[in-house]
């Protein structure tokens, strides 16, 4: 009788949802660990989107396998973009330290547009397995303009997440997977194939 009761707990919807939530928390923790060398931010983020794409329709699971498959996919292109991201953010940070309002505003605009391009890049890579660098760049650039409101919403969500992390750093481990899931949902609305 005790064994039957335990089986019923395991088979409940609540338990199933708990497994999914824990998988997203584990995915977020894995993302944070792989992002520790800053140069791997873009490959790690693309891997998160790859994992979520693999989970569509199948449920969650196989986190580590899918994650490293996602990192391996387009690794060179993503590493190049990570390096470019570090350089651009460093230069924009230097620009924001200037005392003139025009340069500060220019810095924020560049930062916003590049962040939107980065989100579009990650989305395009997660949706297309065999694609050239030029095609990724072209599709990402178009998405910055055609999916402008979605990209802005994702940037605001990520900014809120960063501010939350500054308030209490352990939140990054708890909420990273969920934030990337929300970003994925926002970017895929209306783009389902």
Give each language-model segment a name:
Residues 1-193:
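Helix-coil boundary and N-terminal low-complexity module in membrane systems
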């Amino acid at each position: 009788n005790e064994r039957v009761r335990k089986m019923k707990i395991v088979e409940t919807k609540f338990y199933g949802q708990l497994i999914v939530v824990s998988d997203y928390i584990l995915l977020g923790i894995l993302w944070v660990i792989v992002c520790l060398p800053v140069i791997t931010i873009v490959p790690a983020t693309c891997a998160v989107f790859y994992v979520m794409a693999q989970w569509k329709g199948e449920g969650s699971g196989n986190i580590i396998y899918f994650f490293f498959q996602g990192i391996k996919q387009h690794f060179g292109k993503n590493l190049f973009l990570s390096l470019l991201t570090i350089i651009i953010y460093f230069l924009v940070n230097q620009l924001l330290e200037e005392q003139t309002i025009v340069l500060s505003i220019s810095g924020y605009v560049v930062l916003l547009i590049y962040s939107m391009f980065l989100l579009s890049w990650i989305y395009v890579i997660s949706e297309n397995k065999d694609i050239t660098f030029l095609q990724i760049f072209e599709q990402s650039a178009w998405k910055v303009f055609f999916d402008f409101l979605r990209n802005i919403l994702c940037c605001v969500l990520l900014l809120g997440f960063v501010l939350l992390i500054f308030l209490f750093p352990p939140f990054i481990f708890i909420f990273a997977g969920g934030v990337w899931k929300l970003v994925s949902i926002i970017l895929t609305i209306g783009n389902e194939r």
